[in-house]
Amino acid sequence: MQFTTIASLFAAAGLAAAAPLESRQDTASCPVTTEGDYVWKISEFYGRKPEGTYYNSLGFNIKATNGGTLDFTCSAQADKLEDHKWYSCGENSFMDFSFDSDRSGLLLKQKVSDDITYVATATLPNYCRAGGNGPKDFVCQGVADAYITLVTLPKSS
């Protein structure tokens, strides 16, 4: 019986040793569309967290990737910017945004007409550092560009 047990252990060890280990493919990334008629580049993210937990101002640049002229800064300021709330990108822009600070998630909405509204979303990676207006004051800055693809918002049924 001991021989059978020992032989089984050696056989299992031999099978385990025969299977080559491969390193995980950490450098592989999903392809991201970076240009097109409905693709916009989001860059230059900035924000301020006066108490370290919420934003009171944030903004980012939106630029067309198809050679178009769209290139402007979208921003909002308030005593406390609320998550899950729409803020206008500016007068006559027909664009609004919402930002989820816990995941750095941007939701953008463009009203094209009464019948057509486009939406898009992206994660805006950023880094926050001491802001200088107190121990809990943080200034945040984007660390990478993001690209969004506008899709038509379905009508409610």
Curated annotation (Swiss-Prot):
Q: Which InterPro entries match?
A: AltA1
Q: What is its main location?
A: other
Entry's localization field? Spore wall; Secreted
Disulphide-bonded residues: 74-89, 128-140
What GO cellular component is one of the record's annotations? ascospore wall
| Protein's UniProt keywords contain Mitochondrion | no
Signal peptide limits: 1-18
PROSITE patterns (alphabetical)? AA1
Q: Which UniProt keywords apply?
A: Allergen, Disulfide bond, Secreted, Signal
Q: Which residues form the AA1-like domain?
A: 35-153
Q: Which family does it belong to?
A: Belongs to the ALTA1 family.
Binding partners and assembly? Homodimer; disulfide-linked.
Q: What does this protein do?
A: May bind and inhibit the beta-glucanase activity of host plant thaumatin-like proteins.
What protein is this chain from?
Answer: Major allergen Alt a 1
Its lineage opens with:
Eukaryota, Fungi, Dikarya, Ascomycota, Pezizomycotina
